[in-house]
C-alpha cells in the first residue's frame, strides 16, 4: 500500500505498508508530484512498515517518472522517515548525505512527535 496525503501546513505524509504494485505506484507518485507542484521548503513525513520490495512493474513506473521526481528534490528540504527496518533507516541517512539541501532523519515507528518536531524546526 502507498498512501500519500497532506499533513499539517507544508508537510506531506507518505505511508508505505507492504508491497506496492504498478497501479499503486503510478497513483501515488502522480499524487506526490501534484502535491509538490507549488511547494517550497517542503517536508515529507514517511511511515514505512512491513516493507516488501515493490513489484518489477512498480519499479518500472518509478523509473519512468524519474525526471518528475528529480524536480521535486529542490522543493523539499527535510524528510522524516519512521520505519521498523534498520536498513531503511541507514539508507535514509546515506540518501540525505548524498542529496545537497535535503536533510533526512530516521526515527523509530513510535517517535511521531520527535519526527514532527524535526520537520517543524
Regions found by a protein language model. Give the residues of each.
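Amphipathic, Lys/Arg-enriched alpha-helical "gate/interface" segment within cytosolic domains
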Residues: 1-121
Amino acid at each position: 500500500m502507498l498512501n500519500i496525503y497532506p499533513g499539517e501546513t507544508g508537510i506531506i505524509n507518505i505511508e508505505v505498508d507492504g508491497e506496492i504494485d504498478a497501479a499503486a505506484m503510478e497513483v501515488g507518485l502522480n499524487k506526490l508530484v501534484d502535491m509538490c507542484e507549488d511547494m517550497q521548503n517542503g517536508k515529507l513525513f514517511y511511515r514505512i512498515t512491513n516493507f516488501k520490495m515493490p513489484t518489477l512493474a512498480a519499479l518500472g513506473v518509478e523509473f519512468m517518472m524519474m525526471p518528475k521526481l528529480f524536480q521535486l528534490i529542490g522543493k523539499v528540504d527535510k524528510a522524516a522517515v519512521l520505519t521498523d527496518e534498520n536498513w531503511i533507516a541507514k539508507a535514509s541517512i546515506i540518501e540525505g548525505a548524498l542529496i545537497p539541501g535535503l536533510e533526512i532523519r530516521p526515527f523509530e515507528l513510535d517517535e511521531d512527535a520527535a519526527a514532527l518536531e524535526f520537520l517543524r524546526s
